[in-house]
Regions:
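Extracytoplasmic/lumenal domain signature
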Residues: 21-30, 35-368
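Sec-dependent bacterial lipoprotein signal peptides
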Residues: 1-19
Length: 368
């Protein structure tokens, strides 16, 4: 197990750092970022961001049209209500870029940039959060950048909230009053959504690479590399450990009513009832470390593992089906209508779509 933990740590903690200084990065240096708007899947994978048709896996466009050695993409894209695709670079160019998929350059078949923010000092790993007319974007430089999405500026400015929180790798969460931010330096922050003041900050004793989530009980839940699931009062930051996991909780828990689903690096998958404070069933152990977040679907929960497998479980923890995709899976799958899209590493294809029974519908490999 010690060797397994070392391997996972090297891949996940080291890959982004390598990509940040590797100017013509190629695929496979880090886990890709994945998002969807219901019609297209958006994949951040090394030198390019790809837009892929969910119907047949066809490449619709890529950005940039030609490789730019200063740009490297691994952060999951964020889709705004007006259809812009926002993604940050982990390369030597630390830009946060908004792409307009409805305005395509006919010469390169790449979307034009709607705006760009260049004020960050380090690379982007987390997807930004859109709330009302603001964008809350956390950077590996330890700062929160708050951007106005309606200022009509092509070169964006930002309000900088200095958190001194080390590397910020996870998308912020909000309840409409505060924005919650997790950090690799063990800290959870709450920032007032209107004033941008830090309301509270708490040390968890372990790095927090995943996002905080809000439970049905109104409490905030956070998993950490201290191998604990922590419950917070969102208003005060008072917190307590509600579960000791066998090993590191790397990813963001999945929320389904009163239930939280999460995996750990030892390969355990758990279902926790926030109303009782107890596990719903004995943890299931699929086949390898779990660092991707679970995906809660209508009639099952999908769990992806480091072995390159996807497991579908019912809400009682029974395995319904398994699909061996290959490679390694560190990226949380995304739901898109009737299919689930998965982005593995170390495979010939970049994406695979699965139907509700785990059958492969299509795969995506970029055009030359």
């Amino acid at each position: 197990m010690r060797k397994k933990l070392i391997l996972v740590t090297i891949i996940l903690l080291g890959a982004v750092l390598l990509s940040a200084c590797a100017g013509g990065a190629t695929r496979g240096m880090s886990w890709p970022g994945l998002a969807t708007d219901g019609n297209l899947a958006y994949l951040s994978d090394g030198p390019f961001v790809f837009a892929v048709s969910l119907g047949d896996g066809r490449q619709v466009w890529k950005y940039p049209g030609e490789r730019n050695n200063k740009l490297v993409f691994y952060a999951p894209p964020t889709v705004t209500p007006d259809g812009l695709i926002i993604v940050g670079s982990a390369g030597t160019d630390h830009s946060l870029i908004a792409l307009n998929p409805n305005d395509i350059n006919p010469d390169t078949n790449a979307p034009f940039e709607a705006w760009k923010f260049t004020g960050a000092r380090d690379h982007w790993v987390a997807a930004p959060l859109v709330f009302e007319n603001k964008l809350f974007a956390v950077n590996a430089d330890g700062n929160l950048y708050v951007l106005d999405l309606q200022d009509s500026q092509s070169a964006k400015d930002a309000t900088v909230v200095e958190l001194n929180g080390g590397r910020l790798w996870a998308q912020p969460t909000t309840d409409g009053e505060r924005v919650y931010i997790t950090s690799l330096d063990h800290t959870v922050f709450a920032v007032d959504v209107n004033t941008n003041d830090v309301v509270w900050q708490k040390d968890l004793g372990g790095a927090v690479p995943g996002s905080a989530v809000l439970g049905a009980d109104g409490m905030l839940y956070v998993g950490s590399l201290a191998s604990q699931l922590e419950k917070f009062d969102p208003a005060t930051g008072d917190h307590q450990t509600v579960l000791e996991a066998e090993n590191w909780i790397w990813s963001t828990p999945g929320v389904d009513g009163d239930t939280l689903y999460f995996g750990d690096v030892a390969g355990n998958f758990s279902s926790f009832d926030t109303s009782t404070g107890k596990l719903n069933w004995k943890p299931v152990k699929p086949d390898a470390a779990i660092t991707a977040g679970p995906l809660v679907r209508e009639d099952h929960i999908l769990v992806a593992t480091e072995s390159g497998s996807v497991f579908a479980l019912d809400r009682d923890g029974k395995v319904l089906w398994t699909e061996a995709i290959g490679g390694k899976i560190y990226t949380t799958p995304v739901a898109a209508g009737d299919v689930t899209v998965v982005a593995p590493l170390e495979t010939d294809f970049y994406l695979v779509a699965l139907d509700a029974n785990g059958r492969q519908v299509w795969t995506f490999t970029p055009e030359n």
